[in-house]
């Protein structure tokens, strides 16, 4: 095992620290205020190979300017990357990814007040793209993107958010929260989550295949745009079953022509609401709650 320790480093806004590329079986540990700046298409700021472990202290900052770049990526199985509080990741470029698990059984974890900002089309804020993997955020996480704030595409994988998360997308056909795995996966939010989506045919919470998205109390979902959905459970193939649950005090808004607050299209799937739920829509041909799949239901 090789260990690189860079502790109590003096912070400098003028001199960037080195990118981190942890080789197979290595352990890399850096202290607070570690700052990585990269320019160029296909760049990756922090990467972990098979069985590697990377730990960064508080207030780490990552900036990547270029198409198809990665801020943080697990590219080897059984790898782990962990941040302290106050991490910041900024991506500029098309098809960029802020944070992604790309290898099975890999995990990325953030402390409190992490923020990911992406500028460019076809981008992803946090992406769990491998099986048996996870990305976890502490309280007060913020993700701002054009195309997709968080997606889970690997089976038996999870994205987990602490209290008061704020996720926002601003592009047409954008998905703020996207669960696309075939089986066994989930996205969970603690109290006070805020989901915003502003764009034509955008979706606040999209369950494409199977799995569950769950919110605790006081969740807010707001979408604005023609043909937008606050929540959409799609009937993607025969036999997929999906579920969305809310705690008490949820507020769901959809504004625009033919907009839907909640639409459950998948068969035998469920939308479950706690007490004091408010669903409000505006716009011609807009709908508050609709169920299109055989056996689908709402629990109020």
Language-model features, listed with the residues they occupy:
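Beta-strand-rich solenoid/repeat architectures in extracellular/passenger domains
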Residues: 14, 27-42, 54-68, 80-95, ...
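Gram-negative bacterial Sec-dependent N-terminal signal peptides
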Residues: 1-15
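Glycine-rich beta-solenoid repeat tracts in large extracellular/virion proteins
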Residues: 16-24, 44-50, 70-77, 97-104, ...
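Compositionally biased amphipathic helical and low-complexity segments enriched in hydrophobic
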Residues: 5-8, 57, 119, 168, ...
């Amino acid at each position: 095992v090789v260990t690189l320790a860079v502790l109590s480093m003096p912070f400098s806004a003028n001199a960037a620290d080195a990118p981190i590329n942890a080789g197979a079986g290595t352990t890399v540990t850096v202290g607070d205020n570690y700052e990585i700046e990269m320019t160029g298409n296909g760049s990756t700021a922090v990467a972990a190979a098979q069985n590697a472990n990377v730990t960064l202290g508080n207030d780490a900052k990552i900036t990547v300017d270029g198409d198809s770049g990665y801020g943080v990526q697990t590219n080897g199985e059984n790898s782990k990357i962990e941040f302290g509080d106050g991490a910041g990741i900024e991506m500029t470029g098309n098809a960029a990814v802020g944070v992604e698990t790309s290898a099975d059984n890999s995990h990325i974890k953030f402390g409190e007040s992490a923020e990911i900002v992406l500028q460019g089309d076809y981008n992803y804020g946090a992406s769990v793209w491998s099986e048996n993997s996870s990305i976890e955020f502490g309280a007060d996480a913020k993700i701002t993107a054009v195309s997709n704030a968080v997606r889970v595409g690997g089976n038996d994988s999870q994205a987990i958010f602490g209290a008061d998360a704020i996720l926002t997308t601003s592009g047409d056909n954008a998905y703020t929260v996207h669960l696309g795995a075939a089986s066994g996966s989930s996205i969970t939010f603690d109290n006070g989550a805020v989901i915003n989506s502003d764009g034509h045919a955008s979706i606040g919470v999209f369950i494409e295949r199977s799995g569950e998205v769950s919110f605790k109390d006081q969740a807010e979902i707001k979408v604005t745009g023609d043909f937008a959905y606050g929540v959409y459970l799609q009937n993607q193939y025969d036999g997929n079953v999906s579920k969305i649950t809310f705690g008490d005090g949820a507020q769901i808004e959809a504004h625009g022509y033919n907009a839907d607050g909640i639409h459950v299209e998948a068969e035998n799937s469920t939308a479950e609401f706690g007490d004091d739920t408010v669903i409000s829509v505006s716009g011609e041909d807009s709908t508050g709650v609709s169920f299109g799949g055989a056996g689908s239901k709402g629990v109020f």
